[in-house]
């Protein structure tokens, strides 16, 4: 299961550390906005005027307000994916 978190955790952590605003779309279509205060395996703590604990299983999409750059720790994964895109 840790392999499934190899992209999710660095992505959410970058959004949290850089205090990037996000729109979080839930599976029922509701849009939440704010900044990621914290997260763990099951929930994201989203801060706007109040803090909301959002369960990850209810999330469809996380959209940052600006492009972000992830740490290049997964550089070899990107190299493996490159030939498939050609």
From Swiss-Prot:
Q: Name one GO biological process term.
A: regulation of translation, ncRNA-mediated
Report the SUPFAM superfamilies cross-referenced here: Sm-like ribonucleoproteins
Which ranges carry the Sm domain?
Answer: 9-68
UniProt-recorded Gene Ontology molecular function terms? RNA binding
**What UniProt keywords are attached to this protein's entry?**
RNA-binding, Stress response
**Any one annotated GO CC term:** cytosol
Classification via HAMAP family: Hfq
Subunit record text: Homohexamer.
For this protein, the record's PANTHER family field holds: RNA-BINDING PROTEIN HFQ
Q: Which function does this protein serve?
A: RNA chaperone that binds small regulatory RNA (sRNAs) and mRNAs to facilitate mRNA translational regulation in response to envelope stress, environmental stress and changes in metabolite concentrations. Also binds with high specificity to tRNAs.
Q: Which family does it belong to?
A: Belongs to the Hfq family.
For this protein, the record's NCBIfam families field holds: Hfq, PRK00395.1
Q: What name does the UniProt record give this protein?
A: RNA-binding protein Hfq
Q: Which organism is it from?
A: Pseudomonas fluorescens (strain SBW25)
Gene that this polypeptide is encoded by: hfq
